Design a protein with these regions (language model features):
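Radical SAM enzyme [4Fe-4S]-AdoMet core and its adjacent flexible, acidic
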Residues: 1-133
């Protein structure tokens, strides 16, 4: 069995849970990051400010590294790679405008679906960042 995990912006809250599930099931964890071709792709974790993103990644790596087996190496590799990749703030000259537009689109989709991303963002740091966009 293999687990396929795509890390999204809200999904950074589930990294540890996916790691634990992989270990419980003794399943290989295939990991990737949500693709983004512009700064409006608010579901990409690369929309987060670098300091916040690195803080979350470092917390997860501190938990994962001592416990990992080769089945979870993909997760470690992707997390380490995310720390070296440019965030939207570094890559796009008008990142703030794109991120605001992405937030507006996400909220419109929430209204259609009857969902609320603010209820999904249980990490207080992510919720605070979201509210301040």
């Amino acid at each position: 069995m293999q687990l396929d995990f795509t890390i999204t912006m809200p999904g950074v809250q589930e990294i540890r849970n996916m790691f634990d599930l992989s270990q419980q099931l003794n399943a290989k964890l295939l990991t990737k990051v949500t693709f983004a071709f512009d700064s409006q792709q608010i579901m990409s974790p690369m929309c987060l400010p670098k300091t916040l993103l690195n803080e979350i990644i470092d917390e997860n790596l501190a938990y994962i590294r001592p416990r990992a087996t080769p089945l979870q190496q993909s997760l470690i590799d992707v997390l380490e790679n995310m720390k070296t990749r440019t965030t939207f703030w570094e890559e796009y000259p008008n990142a703030e405008i794109g991120i605001r537009s992405g937030k507006t689109r996400c909220e419109r989709i929430d209204a259609i679906r009857g969902t609320d991303i603010k209820k999904i963002l249980t990490d207080k740091r992510l919720l605070e960042w979201w509210k301040n966009i």
